[in-house]
């Protein structure tokens, strides 16, 4: 399973997010992926990529969200296949916090697209703004997306777990989302059809006339903080640093009130 091949990298990312590797007695066990029946085609694509016998079946059952829900299930029992996946980084049992990008070389674009298809969202907010996001409990996975997002778009994201559930929600919006989605969902790539369609719709979005992009977040350094504290006025500091007076005023207030540490 060469993860430099985008299709295998995609499949592995998808399996890390939505797959379940179960170990039975002796050498028995199985890989199982259950998703909505509307996305069954991706499981058939996995079946074709895998040189071992596997099956795609369906079932209908009641859930907490609907009276009936029809799902598609891909099942793979080969010990050799399970061993390969496990060695690459798909653990047995619960895995949400322990999964991480593989240690071998891999296609980051394919891998992250698989993760986003399984555990992320692509579309528009209630106000009509384009976005792409990924929710994960894994620090390594969140860091991987942040690093790739910076390389692809120049936008930086800081890692912080939600206080309510301890989950990371890495979010990109507006032009940055357009740029990242255009990079990840290129023509002919392996992906969920509905996510690919959503990605294509983002490309058509145009910012309203008169609406300006939000300026990039300032990365304050010790030298910048020292200048803020020693400048005779905020206006002098703003002119020297090339930032707005309001941004400099807020940063200086935080320094003087111990909201952020003073420069060394």
For each predicted feature, which ranges?
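Internal intein/HINT superfamily modules and their associated LAGLIDADG
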Residues: 1-264
């Amino acid at each position: 399973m060469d993860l430099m091949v985008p299709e295998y990298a995609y499949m592995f990312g998808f399996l890390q997010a939505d797959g379940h590797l179960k170990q039975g007695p002796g050498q028995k066990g199985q890989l199982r992926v259950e998703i909505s029946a509307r996305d069954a085609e991706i499981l058939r694509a996995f079946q074709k990529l895998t040189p071992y016998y596997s099956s795609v079946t369906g079932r209908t059952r009641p859930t907490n969200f609907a009276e009936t829900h029809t799902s598609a299930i891909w099942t793979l029992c080969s010990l050799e296949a399970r061993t390969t996946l496990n060695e690459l980084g798909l653990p047995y049992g619960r895995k949400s916090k322990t999964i991480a990008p593989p240690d071998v070389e891999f296609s980051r674009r394919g891998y992250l697209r698989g993760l986003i298809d399984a555990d992320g969202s692509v579309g528009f907010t209630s106000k009509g703004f384009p976005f792409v996001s990924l929710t994960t409990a894994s620090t390594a996975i969140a860091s991987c997306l942040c690093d790739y997002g910076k390389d692809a778009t120049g936008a930086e994201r800081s890692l912080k777990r939600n206080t309510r559930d301890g989950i990371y929600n890495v979010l990109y919006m507006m032009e940055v989302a357009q740029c990242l989605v255009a990079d990840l969902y290129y023509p002919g790539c392996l992906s969920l059809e509905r996510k690919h369609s959503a990605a294509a719709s983002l490309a058509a979005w145009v910012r309203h006339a008169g609406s300006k992009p939000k300026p990039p977040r300032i990365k304050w350094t010790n030298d910048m903080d020292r200048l803020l504290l020693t400048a005779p006025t905020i206006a002098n500091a703003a002119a020297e640093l090339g930032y707005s007076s309001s941004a400099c005023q807020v940063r200086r207030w935080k320094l003087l009130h111990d909201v952020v540490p003073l420069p060394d």
